[in-house]
Every structure is written in structure tokens, then in C-alpha cells.
Amino acid sequence: MTDLESSKAGLNASEQNASQIEQVGGPNYGRYVLFVLIIVYIFNFIDRQILSILAEEIKLDLGIGDAEIGFLYGTAFAIFYAVFGIPLGRLADVWNRRKLISVGLSFWSAMTALSGFAQNFGHLAVCRFGVGIGEASATPAAFSMISDYFSPKVRATVLAIYSSGIYLGSGIGLFLGGAIVQSWHAWYPDPTLAPLGIKAWQAAFLAVGIPGIAMAVWVWSLKEPIRGASEGLVTPEHPAPFKAAGSSFMSVLPGFSLVALYNAGGLRAVATNIVAAGLVSLLFYGLYVAMPTLLQWVALGIGVYITVTWIHYQKLTDPACYGMMFKSKAFLAVTIGFPAISFVTYGIGFWSPPFMQRFHGESIADAGLYLGLGSAVGGFIGIVLGGIVADYFRAKTVNARLYVGLAIPLLAVPFALGFLYTENIAMAYIYSFLFSVISPAWIGCAASTVNDLVMPRMRATASAYYLLMNTFVGLALGPFLIGQFSDLYNRSGVDSAEALQLAMTWGLGAFALSVLALLLACRYLASDETSRLDRAAALGEPV
């Protein structure tokens, strides 16, 4: 029997078990939940992406450079999003997921609104930390909920539809941000006459943050699905969810993590962790010497150290979950390959509005409108089509989802270069739209592949780790490094428009890493998926 035939046989057996389990809310309720969660994801990315269109206004008002803006958008958000995503992912695996999403939505919306009162770089950074913590609660829990409402056969398509909220939210955020700023300037040409002296960019944060708090009430009303129902692998409720999640929180808090490691593995575990801390410190000191931006490398270094500590703690306390993730070569390759694509999409996506303003002299409203519309429509088409194509061809090859990821660099690079180097404004927007169609086609493929490699009770944890990698590689490094190189070019005498153009061009090089990692994943995915239940049983997991 081939790997594909074995995979199909296992899937059919799971579906037979799943068909005997009555779904919460009836057969169509899952579609309703999906609709609500898409709206949550739209709010998620409005609050995250609006900083892009406000960047030039914030730079002018606070007197900061491209690297600092890249830090605010990327690292300041990403470190807290990624690190808190680990324990919040664990909480999603053992507690009520819709309650977790609702509480998180309230918190990040409040922190977005508070950004509207920021008076300096430090205030805004703290608010971005808070947005990152709140948003970390949503996607791992949503991935897990959706996977329990829909069959594995359509998982890439459904998760792609959910993930369309990324581009719908990003597009709406760009449009709203630009429209609010232009309107505010028209209403209050003298900022001192505005209510409470609020600047245009501050008003934009307030306008998009407050509605999310009301949305949280709607999310609270959703019904929780039966965990594992879609695959006939029902998982019983955890007897002490907050204790389990609390242990995971301890494992990511520096200082407390040493206590957690000692309790789990004794002095040897603590000594190993101290050695790891030293190695991480040396690595990031080297990066600081090469690119002396202290806050960036300290923050990212702490994030990487916390991740290493959590992986070690996971190995000691949940060896089955650790083994299903980190002993799977396909899982490791996928969680490098897809995030490398994210480096490009986050970097190009964030810097596109400032690029249009500098290189083409576009107004903030026009850049927000046309880039936002192109991102929303193009991204929605690309994400959904990517999931549909992957699920269709998966009936023919297990690697179909990976092939979608491998096709993206080949198809996206020409459109990215066209966007960066055409001198025709209309063509720039057309190239941006086409890039928005192609570049996100992998998103549903990545999420479904990660979920299919682990057991149902591990989905949110596995998703949290995948999102952590996606956040570190894509969000923390993409916008920052492009901003850093833009500043370097600018200081060498290149004007700001050309400096940003050159930096964004170099950013496309991350596609090379994605191709190498996904080719490696193609070698192992079929065997790792086929052996999922056997691997779990060998690790002591009840199946």
C-alpha cells in the first residue's frame, strides 16, 4: 500500500467515527461559527495593519525613523504575540476556546484604542505589546475550533477562508486609516483645536479599537464544539485547565521558568537552560554588533530564549506533544518554509504604503484606498483559491499543499519587482494587486498541514508554535530588516524613496529559504501523516 493509499484509509476510518458523533449546533452551525471567526480575524488585522498607513504621520509627530517604525509594527508586537501564544495555545487546548477568543478580543481592542492616547515612542510600544498579547489568544483557538467543526477533507479550504480575514482586515485597515487621517486633517487643520488635542493618527487608533470590544460579546455567545469530533477522536475535558495552562505560563516567564524546569527535570534541566541562555546571548550580541539596534535584538533574543525554554519544558512535561511536533521532520521543515514566505509578505505589505507615498508622491488617502482595496480583494481571492487548489490536488498527491507554497516565489517575484520599479502609478497598483493574489495562497495550506500532523488535543499548541515561527521570522524580522536597510541606504546618501525600494528588493531573497525548506518537507510529509496514530501510540498517547 502506498503512502497516499494509507493516508486515505486512515482518513476514511476517522470519517466513519466522526459521522457517529452529533455535531454541536447542527450541520450548518459550523459555517456560522466560521463567519463570526472571520470577522474576529478582520478586527485582528485591522488593529495590526493600520500602523502601516499611519507610519509617515507617526514618524513626523514622534520624530522616529524607519527602523523604529519597523520595530513598532514588527518586533514590539511580534515578541509578545509569539511568546504569549504558547501558553494561550495550551489554554485553548484544555479550556473553552470561544471564551478565550472573546476575552482576548476585548483586551487587544482596548490596547488599540489606548494607542490613541500615546504621546511618545515608549507609550506606543507598550500599547503594541498589549495588542500582541491579546491577539495571541485568537488564532490558535480559532484553528482548533474550526478543525473540530469541519472534516479534514476540506480543512485547507476552510482554514484558507478563515485566513482571508488577514487580507480583508489589512485592506480595511489601510483604507480606514487613510480616510480617517485625511478627514481629521480637513476637520482640524490646527491640531490644537481637535478634541483633547488628539492627532489624526491617534483618532484612527481610537476609531478602530473601540468596536472590537462590542464584537467580543458576540463571540462569547458561540457554542463550543466537541474536541476531536470531526475525526472521531473525541478528547475528554481537562480536569484542571488553568493549572495546565498556568504551568505553561510559568515555562515562558524568565526566572519562573527556571523553577518550572527544576520541578520538571531537576538541576540538570536548569543547567541545560543556563547553557542555552548563554548561547542565545552570544548569537544576539553578534547580531547587535553587526546591526547596532539594541532594543530590537534584546527583545528578539528574549523571545528566542523563552521559546527554547518552552520547548525544553514541553519535552519534560508532555513528551507526546513534544514528539509529535519536534520529532516530525515534516513539521520542522513546514514551520520554517512557510514562515520564510511570511518574511516577504509582511515586509512588502507593511512598507508598500510608505513606498507609494515616497516614490510616487501619493496621498495617504489614495495609498490607503487603492492598496487597501487591492489587498482585501486580491488577498481574499488568493487565500481561498490556494486552499481550494491544494485540497483538490491533495486527492492526487499528499504534497499538494507544499506544492502551492513552492509555486509562490516563482509567481510572486515578477509582480513584486514590477510594483517596485515601474514609474507608472496605475501599473504599480495593478502589480500590487497581483502580488496580493499570489503571495497569500499558502496560508490555508500551512495551517492545515500543521494541524494534520498532530493529535486533536495538540492542535492549538502546534498552531501556536507555527504562529510563533511565522511571527518571529515574518513579522519581527521582515518589516524591521527592510526598515534597517532602508535607513542604511539613506544614511549613505541615497534618497528615502530609492533607499526603501532597494531594501524591499533585498527582502525578496527570503523566498530562497522557503523553497529549500518546503522541498525538504516534501520528502517526509507523506510518511509523517500516515504514521500519525502509530507515532502517537509509541509516545504513550491514547489513540
Where are these regions (language model features)?
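Extracytoplasmic gate region of multi-pass secondary transporters
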Residues: 51-52, 265-299, 329-376, 383, ...
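C-terminal transmembrane helical hairpin of 12-TM major facilitator-type secondary transporters
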Residues: 398-446
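Extracellular/periplasmic helix-loop-helix junction of adjacent transmembrane segments
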Residues: 54-83
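Cytoplasmic membrane-interface "Motif A"-like loop-to-helix N-cap segments
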Residues: 94-105, 391-408
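Helix-loop-helix hairpin linking two adjacent transmembrane segments in secondary transporters
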Residues: 166-227, 261-300
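Helix-breaking motifs and short loop linkers at transmembrane-helix boundaries and internal kinks
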Residues: 63, 96, 117-123, 134, ...
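Central cavity-lining transmembrane alpha-helices of secondary-active solute carriers
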Residues: 72-90, 143, 373-386, 477
